[in-house]
C-alpha cells in the first residue's frame, strides 16, 4: 500500500536565524495528517533565551517581547518536540520536513546545548527516519528546472495552498501536502516506494546533488568550495 494515503507527520521550526549550530527555536509544529487531511496538530512557542533578531521576527511574526512573555523555556520545548518526533519514528510514521538538514540539525544542536539526549540517542543509536524531504525529492525528480526551490515555490508548482507562510503549523502542513503531490506526480520514483526505501533514496539524491553543486562551484567560482551533502541531518 502506498504511503500517500497513510498517516504522515509534518514538522517545521521557526527560529532566530539561519545557521543550525547557532540559531535557536522560536516556534515548532507537528501536524499529523492522513491522506493530507489534518488529524492532529501540536504547536510550541519557546523563549529562546536570546534576543530574536528583527529580521527573523519580521519573517515568522514572533518578537523577543512576545517570546519572553508567552514562550516556554526552550529546553522544555526542544525536549518535547524531540520526544514526539521519536515516538512517531518508533511507530513507523514518516515525518515530512522541507529541508530536513536545517530543522533536524538545529533541533539536535538545541538538545546538545541544554544537555539533553540527541534524536539518535533517543532512538537507540539509530538515525532519525523515515524522513520525507520535498526539497530533496523535487531537486531529484525535476533536476533541471530553473528558479527558486523554496517551500512557497514548490507549493505553486505542485498545486498546494500555503496560507500564512513561515508559521510553523502552516509550513508543516504545506510540506506534507507537497510530499503527497510529488508522490502522485512521480509514482515510480516516489509514490510507490516504501517510506524506508524512499528515505534511503533521498540520502543518495542529496549526496549526488551536493557533489554536482560542489563541482560547479569549483569550476565557476571557488576552487576550494565544499558542499556538505549530509542528509537528513548534518
Regions found by a protein language model. Give the residues of each.
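Short, surface-exposed acidic-centric catalytic microdomains
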Residues: 40-60
Amino acid at each position: 500500500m502506498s504511503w500517500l494515503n497513510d498517516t504522515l507527520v509534518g514538522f517545521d521550526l521557526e527560529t532566530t536565524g539561519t545557521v543550525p549550530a547557532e540559531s535557536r527555536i522560536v516556534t515548532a509544529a507537528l501536524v499529523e495528517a492522513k491522506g493530507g487531511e489534518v488529524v492532529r496538530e501540536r504547536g510550541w512557542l519557546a523563549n529562546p533565551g536570546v534576543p530574536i533578531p528583527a529580521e527573523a521576527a519580521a519573517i515568522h511574526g514572533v518578537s523577543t517581547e512576545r517570546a519572553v512573555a508567552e514562550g516556554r523555556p526552550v529546553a522544555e520545548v526542544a525536549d518535547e518536540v524531540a520526544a514526539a518526533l521519536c515516538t512517531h519514528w518508533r511507530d513507523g510514521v514518516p515525518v515530512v520536513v522541507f529541508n530536513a538538514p536545517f530543522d533536524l540539525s538545529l533541533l539536535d544542536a538545541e538538545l546538545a546545548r541544554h544537555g539533553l539526549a540527541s534524536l539518535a540517542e533517543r532512538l537507540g543509536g539509530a538515525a532519525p527516519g523515515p524522513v520525507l524531504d520535498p526539497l530533496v525529492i523535487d531537486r531529484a525528480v525535476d533536476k533541471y528546472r530553473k528558479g527558486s526551490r523554496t517551500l512557497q515555490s514548490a507549493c505553486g508548482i505542485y498545486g498546494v495552498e500555503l496560507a500564512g507562510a513561515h508559521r510553523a503549523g502552516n509550513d508543516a502542513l504545506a510540506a506534507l501536502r507537497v510530499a503527497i503531490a510529488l508522490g502522485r506526480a512521480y509514482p515510480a520514483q516516489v509514490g510507490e516506494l516504501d517510506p524506508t526505501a524512499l528515505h534511503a533514496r533521498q540520502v543518495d539524491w542529496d549526496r549526488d546533488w551536493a557533489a554536482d553543486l560542489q563541482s560547479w562551484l569549483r569550476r565557476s567560482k571557488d576552487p576550494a568550495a565544499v558542499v556538505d551533502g549530509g542528509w537528513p541531518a548534518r
